């Protein structure tokens, strides 16, 4: 599918299966989400630019590659996006962080924005937007809209699960933003939830209803 990468790594798929199971505990779900996020981060950042600095090993001085972390921003769509954010920051602790507060109105299924905070100079940074679910796509579209309004031009979107409807809507709204996902599920139900899915990621992560 154009503009979409499905990450089929065996460890990702194995852990995703355990996250889908309805009997998985809140603690287990949260742990698995953090573990998967590190694997997704590995894939989505494989082409990040490196710079060189001079270091001393126990043997000699050498020129060695290091990541330009200050050029990277992780943008979490609250609240469930924080589950992906934590694992990614484990790998790139020097990255900047943005939070976009958007929730889906359960009656209209439209996105409602309530919070936004981002680093300066977004136009100079790669912005990786994270949210476990790409369902209708409305919340993700709204979040990327806001980031672009603040100057972001180089963005990627990372999720655990995506519905075909959400991918279609998101790609139509933001054809310049590549989507990375662990799986593309069958469809959305009448309530806008991904089927077979894994339920509400935020509720399962935080033990709420």
UniProtKB/Swiss-Prot annotation:
Pathway: Pyrimidine metabolism; UMP biosynthesis via salvage pathway; UMP from uracil: step 1/1. Coiled coil: none annotated. Its cofactor is Mg(2+). Disulfide bonds: none annotated. Binds 1 Mg(2+) ion per subunit. The magnesium is bound as Mg-PRPP. It catalyses: UMP + diphosphate = 5-phospho-alpha-D-ribose 1-diphosphate + uracil. Its EC number is 2.4.2.9. Keywords: Allosteric enzyme, Glycosyltransferase, GTP-binding, Magnesium, Nucleotide-binding, Transferase. It holds the Pfam family UPRTase. The keyword Transcription does not apply. Allosterically activated by GTP. GO terms for molecular function: GTP binding; magnesium ion binding; uracil phosphoribosyltransferase activity. It is an enzyme of class 2 (transferase). Signal peptide: none annotated. The keyword GTP-binding applies. 5-phospho-alpha-D-ribose 1-diphosphate binds at residues 79, 104, 131-139, 200. Catalyzes the conversion of uracil and 5-phospho-alpha-D-ribose 1-diphosphate (PRPP) to UMP and diphosphate. Belongs to the UPRTase family. This is Uracil phosphoribosyltransferase. The lineage of its organism: Bacteria, Pseudomonadati, Pseudomonadota, Alphaproteobacteria, Hyphomicrobiales. The gene is upp.
């Amino acid at each position: 599918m154009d503009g979409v990468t499905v990450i089929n790594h065996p460890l990702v798929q194995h852990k995703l299966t355990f996250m889908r199971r309805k009997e998985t505990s809140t603690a287990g779900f949260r742990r698995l989400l953090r573990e998967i996020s590190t694997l997704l981060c590995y894939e989505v950042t494989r082409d990040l630019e490196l710079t060189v600095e001079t270091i001393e090993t126990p043997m000699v001085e050498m020129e060695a590659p290091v990541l330009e972390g200050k050029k990277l921003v992780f943008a979490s769509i609250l609240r469930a996006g924080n589950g992906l954010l934590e694992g990614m920051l484990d790998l790139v602790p020097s990255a900047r962080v943005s939070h976009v507060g958007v929730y889906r109105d359960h009656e209209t299924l439209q996105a409602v924005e309530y919070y936004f905070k981002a680093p300066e100079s977004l136009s100079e940074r790669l912005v990786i937007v994270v949210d476990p679910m790409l369902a209708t796509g409305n919340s993700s579209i709204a979040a990327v809209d806001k980031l672009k309004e603040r100057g972001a031009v180089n963005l990627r979107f990372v999720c655990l699960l995506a519905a075909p409807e959400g991918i279609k809507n998101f790609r139509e709204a933001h054809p310049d933003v590549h989507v990375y996902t662990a799986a593309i599920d069958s469809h959305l139900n009448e309530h806008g939830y991904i089927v077979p899915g894994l339920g509400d990621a935020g509720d399962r992560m935080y033990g709420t209803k």
